[in-house]
Amino acid sequence: MMQVYHLSHIDLDGYACQLVSKQFFKNIQCYNANYGREVSARIYEILNAIAQSKESEFLILVSDLNLNLNEAEYLQDKIQEHRLQNKNIQIQLLDHHISGKEVAESFHWYFLDINRCATKIVYEFLKKHYAILEPKNTTWLEPLVEMVNSVDIWDTQGYGFELGKVCMRMINQSSELNRFMFDDENRNYKLKLLEEVKNYLFLENAPVAYDNDLFKLKKIALGGDPDAETMDNISSNAQTHLLSLKKHDCSVYYQDKKGFLSYSMGGISVLANLFLTQNPDFDFYMDVNAKGNVSLRANGNCDVCELSQMCFNGGGHRNASGGKIDGFRESFNYRDIKEQIEEIFNNA
């Protein structure tokens, strides 16, 4: 079976592309990136996954992202190397950003159409070359694609424009699950909320109905009871559960104290205290953001004020403190962050 790797943008159009591709492929792994260095980081992850895969046939699908010349050349060169190892790999980039025009003219696999959104390009391309898994899904998929197209190219008279605006805000503000710590879960959460739109597309007042129900739909998607639990508690419980599944990979040690390291979670007070209460084998919780700022929390088992002073030129309280990492190297890879923290702790 062909293995598909789908890299897409982090806005409504980008995620809608992946909602579409999941209707055509069973064996698919999705990745998302904003522009800049994250694109190269995700391409590297895909190539690494191919190198480790036992499959022999692959499709790399890139949507709603325009690669620069260096990124396109790197991807093509690496694919050629894999092909020499008897791996059948196809590349297809489907985009609509005019900034990719020059690169599109240099690579046959780079398709550019500035008149349609990426979701519509992806849908029409896949419909032409592959069979949809459930043909009945076209009854909601096609109008959903048209809705995304209307709002993405800002056709105010287009189909579902107002509903598309609600969806655009939904994607932008659905940050309950951190993208860097919970990549798959974050994506699946957004795709689930987007797919829920199929139940509203044909309602008379669809934009208002979906907008009114969205908060409740979010609670349900996060595994909570919308009539009995607050979003704060539902979100914290969901995140704590996911963090607990990562205990082995995210453990760090400072002297005789065991800590949990997260990256770019932000606003950790409620989450950290809940995590430490439910996981008493941990003495402290720490979160590092993209600028190297450190937040530390404890529950009486570790003096994080002293830890922060010794390791991060910071301070605060025994159970709540903060600091900053000197010479911090930003990364889109959690392992890189953890290695920096381990180096600091080992040298403290």
Swiss-Prot record:
GO molecular function annotations of the record: 3',5'-cyclic-nucleotide phosphodiesterase activity; nucleotide binding
Disulfide bond found in the keyword field: no
Keyword terms: cAMP, cGMP, Hydrolase, Manganese, Nucleotide-binding
Catalytic activity reported: a nucleoside 3',5'-cyclic phosphate + H2O = a nucleoside 5'-phosphate + H(+)
SUPFAM superfamilies attached to this UniProt entry: DHH phosphoesterases (SSF64182)
pH dependence: Optimum pH is 4.0-4.5.
Domain of life, per lineage: Bacteria
Protein function: Hydrolyzes cAMP to 5'-AMP and cGMP to 5'-GMP. Does not show phosphohydrolase activity toward various phosphatidylcholine and phosphorylated sugars.
Cross-referenced PANTHER family: 3',5'-CYCLIC-NUCLEOTIDE PHOSPHODIESTERASE (PTHR42146), OLIGORIBONUCLEASE NRNB (PTHR42146:SF1)
Protein name (record): 3',5'-cyclic-nucleotide phosphodiesterase
Organism for this UniProt entry: Helicobacter pylori (strain ATCC 700392 / 26695) (Campylobacter pylori)
UniProt lineage: Bacteria, Pseudomonadati, Campylobacterota, Epsilonproteobacteria, Campylobacterales
